[in-house]
Structures are given as structure tokens and as C-alpha cells.
């Protein structure tokens, strides 16, 4: 099957790292264009050196490129505010969109949990870095027993948080909280992000807490380990920091949206080290987003290729 041509909109850290991942590891996708708005950006310069067609004229520049007619999938690595226009423009040209912003126009996708559920959707949202790291764990627990409440804390190196991340803090917490419920399966979800200013920068660390009824702790631990292994298939630096912890709550505690609650608290500590393709190893928060986006695009490209093959056969 011929690889699917893709464009990346946004030549910053995430867009550049994603480009390098596609160039090195793309199986069903290949670079067709890199789009930015700053002619002097390092991302566009690097793309040019690597032989990728570029434009510094944004989405309008992409439409004017001779290569645009071959583009089947576009990644948006800009901002939630800009994404609405980008999406509308691309949809008008029948281009599938993979959204790396918190705009959440399309369904949430976490490849290890629901990659196969929305392959026909015109727009797929990759949630957030914190969501990509923690929602699989919530889903693992929920596969064993109902999760009444899940709370995640994503701690990332301040140095790895660019202007887009900082401008989208509110969208980050809102989008991640909703996806904890809709993808992770928790009845209620809450997300917190911490920008850690420590020097030297620390790698991404995540804490996942789930409140459940009494359940088979061995089955939960096995489900968590299986999910970690699945995650490592596309994010090799994803790992469990220590054993899954279980604490019984006999005295009722007030849970947002649920009221006084007792039960079993499951706590999982994670760390995510980046592959250092372009970004430093401590920027696991960015690496997990680009890795998840590539994994998602591979599935979409396969589906597009299969559909094209079936149409040709008929």
C-alpha cells in the first residue's frame, strides 16, 4: 500500500518532533508538507534541510502548495484558537485532521484505549499530554471495576512548556477532565497540571488516583501492567515508577460531584521519558503527544488505504 501523504501545521517543537518521527518511523504515512507562519523558524529550516516541502504562509500557504492535492491527513500542532479555522478549511478539501491542540472539535483518541473506534471521523482530537499518559491507566482500572472518580496530576518540566501550552492551561484541564470520563470510563474526572521549574529539568511524571468499590486488587494490578506494556509499544519511555498502591477509605471523604464516599483508592505513579528525536529526553510530555499522533495517523492511513483498495476492486 502506498504511504499516505501528510501535512503538519505548526513548525514549533511539537510539529518538528512529529516530522522527524514520521521521517524516521512512518510506515503508512510520509511527509508531504510542513506549514508555519515564521519564515525564520527552526522547524521550517530543518524541514527544508530534510527535503520536506514548506510554507511560511500558514493554512492559506498550504492550500497554494502544489503538493496539497496529495495530502490526505493533516496534523494541527498550533493552538486551540487557530484550530477551528484550520479544521473548517481542511474539511472543505476532504482532508482528515488529527488535532494536537485542546480544541476538541472531534472525538478524543488515546491509541492504546480507543484507536479503532473513530477511524472514519473527519477530525480526531489527541486530548493532551497528561491525558495521553494517564487515561490509559484509568481505562485499565475501569476494565476491572467501575471507577467512581479519577484524578490525575501531570507534572512537566517548565522548560518543555512553550507558549502554546501556557496559553492553553485552562483548555488542558477541561479537555483532560472530560476525556478521563468519556475515554477512561470514570464517572467523574479531574485533571491538574504542574509546571516544574526545577533545574536541571525533570522528566514528565504523572499520578493517577482512582476511587472504586472493593475489587480484585491483583486483577487491577495485572490490568495496569498490561496497559503499560501496550503503551510502551509506541512510547518506549513510558513506565511505572513503583508498584500500584491500594488504600482503603473507611471514613467518608467528599468527592467532587459524588459527595461523601468510601471505598478503595488506587494510586499509580508514572514517568514518561522522551525518545529525544528532536526534543530533549525530559520533554516526555511532548514526546507522548507526537508518538500518539503518529500511532493514530498510521491507523487512519491504513483505513484510508483499505477503503481505497475496496473501492478500486468494486
UniProtKB/Swiss-Prot annotation:
| Amino-acid positions noted as binding NAD(+) in the UniProt annotation, renumbered to this chain | 11-14, 160-168, 285
Identify the stretch annotated as signal peptide in this record: none
UniProt-listed Enzyme Commission number(s)? 1.2.1.10
Q: Name one GO molecular function term.
A: acetaldehyde dehydrogenase (acetylating) activity
Please give the organism: Cupriavidus metallidurans (strain ATCC 43123 / DSM 2839 / NBRC 102507 / CH34)
Name the UniProt record assigns to this protein: Acetaldehyde dehydrogenase 2
| SMART domains per record | Semialdhyde_dh
Q: Which GO terms describe its biological process?
A: catabolic process
The family this protein is said to belong to: Belongs to the acetaldehyde dehydrogenase family.
Pfam families per record = AcetDehyd-dimer, Semialdhyde_dh
Residues of the active site are 129 (acyl-thioester intermediate)
Q: Which UniProt keywords apply?
A: Aromatic hydrocarbons catabolism, NAD, Oxidoreductase, Plasmid
Question: What catalytic activity is recorded?
Answer: acetaldehyde + NAD(+) + CoA = acetyl-CoA + NADH + H(+)
Q: What domain of life?
A: Bacteria
Amino acid at each position: 500500500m502506498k504511504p499516505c501523504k501528510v501535512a503538519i501545521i505548526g513548525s514549533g517543537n511539537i510539529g518538528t518532533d512529529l516530522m522527524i518521527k514520521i521521517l524516521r518511523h512512518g510506515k503508512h504515512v510520509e511527509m508531504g508538507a510542513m506549514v508555519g507562519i515564521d519564515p525564520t523558524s527552526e522547524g521550517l529550516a530543518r524541514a527544508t534541510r530534510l527535503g520536506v516541502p514548506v510554507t511560511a504562509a500558514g493554512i492559506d500557504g498550504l492550500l497554494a502548495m502544489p503538493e496539497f492535492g496529495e495530502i490526505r491527513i493533516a496534523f494541527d500542532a498550533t493552538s486551540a484558537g487557530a484550530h477551528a479555522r484550520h479544521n473548517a478549511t481542511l474539511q472543505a478539501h476532504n482532508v482528515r485532521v488529527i488535532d494536537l491542540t485542546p480544541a476538541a472539535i472531534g472525538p478524543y483518541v488515546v491509541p492504546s484505549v480507543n484507536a479503532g473506534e473513530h477511524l472514519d471521523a473527519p477530525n480526531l482530537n489527541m486530548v493532551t499530554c497528561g491525558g495521553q499518559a494517564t487515561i490509559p491507566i484509568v481505562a485499565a482500572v475501569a476494565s476491572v471495576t467501575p471507577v467512581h472518580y479519577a484524578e490525575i496530576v501531570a507534572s512537566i518540566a517548565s522548560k518543555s512548556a512553550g507558549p502554546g501550552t501556557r496559553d492553553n492551561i485552562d483548555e488542558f484541564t477541561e479537555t483532560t477532565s472530560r476525556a478521563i470520563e468519556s475515554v477512561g470510563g470514570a464517572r467523574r474526572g479531574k485533571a491538574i497540571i504542574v509546571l516544574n521549574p526545577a533545574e536541571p529539568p525533570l522528566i514528565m511524571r504523572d499520578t493517577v488516583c482512582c476511587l472504586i468499590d472493593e475489587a480484585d486488587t491483583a486483577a487491577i494490578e495485572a490490568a495496569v501492567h498490561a496497559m503499560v506494556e501496550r503503551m510502551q509499544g509506541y512510547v518506549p519511555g513510558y513506565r511505572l515508577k513503583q508498584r500500584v498502591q491500594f488504600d482503603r477509605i473507611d471514613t467518608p471523604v467528599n468527592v467532587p460531584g459524588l459527595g461523601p464516599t468510601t471505598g478503595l483508592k488506587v494510586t499509580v505513579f508514572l514517568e514518561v521519558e522522551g525518545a529525544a528525536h528532536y526534543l530533549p529526553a525530559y520533554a516526555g510530555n511532548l514526546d507522548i503527544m507526537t508518538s500518539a499522533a503518529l500511532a493514530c495517523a498510521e491507523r487512519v492511513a491504513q483505513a484510508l488505504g483499505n477503503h481505497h483498495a475496496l473501492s478500486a476492486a468494486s
